């Protein structure tokens, strides 16, 4: 039987090819690091439950997207139905950092009229001696776009949990404040299953009818 969860958040992980998107997701969802990882073709799907507060769990649907240009038309279709995302670059590959702006602009075009909460992720921080992007300039770019910045390593399991849980908590706070709402026809946020809780007026009416019988 599936564990109980309060909400389901659909997340998307984007960035250039070879920045380590699949490795990061597999470390988070499966607890393992693959030394050799085949390039993602189109989109792959993963899921995991995260407990953000005692007794409050969020189900994450995580979409791993291909970074190659020839798959962009496929991955763009998933932007609109995502509420959050990790935007990855490789700290040893300056070009992948320079392309962050392009990824963000592309996302803005395809998510309308909704919004995506992003965290900027500098991946492969275990290769610090090969760094081509300083933490300072990455933090500056993230601040310019209103994003958090975090550095991770799938190989050494550094900040992998933190990247996903911080993003989940940020989305959860926006949902609690009513700044992000569940909307018909949008898959970004869905209400979960909580026992002994009436979720709609229709359910109340059904309950009252049963009592009158």
UniProtKB/Swiss-Prot annotation:
It comes from the Eukaryota. This is Ras-related protein Rab-39B. The modification Cysteine methyl ester is found at residue 213. NCBIfam families: small_GTP. Its cofactor is Mg(2+). A lipid is attached at residues 211, 213 (S-geranylgeranyl cysteine). GTP binds at residues 17, 20-23, 37, 40, 67, 123-124, 126, 154-155. It is found in: Cell membrane; Cytoplasmic vesicle membrane; Golgi apparatus; Cytoplasmic vesicle, Autophagosome membrane. The gene is RAB39B. The keyword Isomerase does not apply. It comes from Homo sapiens (Human). Residues 67-83 are annotated as: Switch-II.
